[in-house]
C-alpha cells in the first residue's frame, strides 16, 4: 500500500491519497 499511497501523494493526492486508493480498488 505504501507504493500506491506514495504514487497518489506524488500526483497531489495528499490526505485524500489513501481514501482514493480504497475507492479505486472497490471500483475496480
UniProtKB/Swiss-Prot annotation:
GO terms under biological process: adaptive immune response; blood coagulation; innate immune response
Post-translational modification: Conversion of fibrinogen to fibrin is triggered by thrombin, which cleaves fibrinopeptides A and B from alpha and beta chains, and thus exposes the N-terminal polymerization sites responsible for the formation of the soft clot. The soft clot is converted into the hard clot by factor XIIIA which catalyzes the epsilon-(gamma-glutamyl)lysine cross-linking between gamma chains (stronger) and between alpha chains (weaker) of different monomers.
Domain of life: Eukaryota
Keyword Coiled coil included in the entry's annotation: yes
Localization per record: Secreted
This protein's UniProt keywords: Adaptive immunity, Blood coagulation, Coiled coil, Disulfide bond, Hemostasis, Immunity, Innate immunity, Phosphoprotein, Secreted
Keyword Cytoplasm: no
A GO cellular component entry from the record: extracellular region
Positions of post-translational Phosphoserine modification: 3
Role of this protein: Cleaved by the protease thrombin to yield monomers which, together with fibrinogen beta (FGB) and fibrinogen gamma (FGG), polymerize to form an insoluble fibrin matrix. Fibrin has a major function in hemostasis as one of the primary components of blood clots. In addition, functions during the early stages of wound repair to stabilize the lesion and guide cell migration during re-epithelialization. Was originally thought to be essential for platelet aggregation, based on in vitro studies using anticoagulated blood.
Domain notes: A long coiled coil structure formed by 3 polypeptide chains connects the central nodule to the C-terminal domains (distal nodules). The long C-terminal ends of the alpha chains fold back, contributing a fourth strand to the coiled coil structure.
Self-association state and partner proteins as the record states: Heterohexamer; disulfide linked. Contains 2 sets of 3 non-identical chains (alpha, beta and gamma). The 2 heterotrimers are in head to head conformation with the N-termini in a small central domain.
Protein name per Swiss-Prot or TrEMBL: Fibrinogen alpha chain
Organism: Canis lupus familiaris (Dog)
Amino acid at each position: 500500500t505504501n507504493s500506491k499511497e506514495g504514487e497518489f501523494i506524488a500526483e497531489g493526492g495528499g490526505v485524500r491519497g489513501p481514501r482514493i486508493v480504497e475507492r479505486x480498488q472497490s471500483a475496480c
